[in-house]
């Protein structure tokens, strides 16, 4: 090998010469120890010579393209700073209307709103670092950790027999036609788009399918379109040979309803909770009579933070305003009495009047927790216990906080999912 010193002005040539010196020494050792014969060494040398000789062309090519890459990255970062933020957004229907009001306000009001916006950003950023380690919030949206734990058939048979009077009947897998409906709205005419909600959709679809449900998906609907979709779903004949159903709603929201895609303050577009319950009650959906009807809602219910500060250790618990007794009525056949609203459970992402948080990059915290706890415990725990575990994961308030609530619970038995059976 030539002993020529590499030029300091040509780093590529320097690397070439150093590489040749090192390889020559290695090849000599391989020949001396009979690891390679002359022909093998010649073929290997041809390939290495090609790589070394073309290294200069590669560096020139990279150098030329690096300038273009740098310009693209610079433009992207400066024109789309929001894509790099790791902020949580709440699902309140007030967001966009507040922005439209700001455009017509005085400069002083605009400055105040800017300060409030910065405070929210700081709080959201702090929340991402304030999540307690016991809450598995890294398990987000469509990428939950682990698989659904299946219930051993022997355990399923034993519990089904021993607690037959306490649990809802579970149909055999063969011939069973479970259905679930997911309504997810991401794009809105006047409200902010719900970026990250597609991960919630994929995660819930995967969970429900693994639990044995055929999932019907509806996206970006107005309130009227949502009502139509619900009535069509309630009329599906598959419910007759099913033992339960899930209804999942993901959108912006108000206190007692889900916002449609055309909602704004001047012209509300809201599907009210009462409408959902009315469509699936025993009067209007007899195919699901005496069968669990699980409603899950990811949406804000106001703009409150949902926290209170105490100066002492004492404090009064707030009253639950949704635990009202439901009246019973006579069904149309006038032969057998049945409660109009029965076998429902609604699990909402926040308490009344308060916000619910969603991460643009990983979806909503509420949905991710549901997915995690269902996968971990649905093989052995009934539904209310699983929901309670989700609630406990939110028990300690963080910088931004929410507390899921169980409402309009009219189940008279325990609902076990027995995944795998």
Swiss-Prot record:
Function: Involved in the activation cascade of caspases responsible for apoptosis execution.
Name of the molecule in the record: Caspase-12
Compositionally biased region (Acidic residues): 109-118
CDD domains for the chain: CARD_CASP1-like, CASc
Keywords carried by this UniProt record: Apoptosis, Hydrolase, Phosphoprotein, Protease, Thiol protease, Zymogen
EC number: 3.4.22.-
A single GO molecular function term of this UniProt record: cysteine-type endopeptidase activity
Domain of life assignment: Eukaryota
Catalytic residue positions: 252, 300
Organism: Macaca mulatta (Rhesus macaque)
Family: Belongs to the peptidase C14A family.
Keyword Protease appears in the UniProt entry: yes
GO biological process, one term: proteolysis
Enzyme class, UniProt record, top EC level: hydrolase
Phosphoserine, modified sites: 85
Domain (CARD): residue spans on this chain: 1-92
Quaternary assembly: Heterotetramer that consists of two anti-parallel arranged heterodimers, each one formed by two subunits (Potential). May interact with TRAF2.
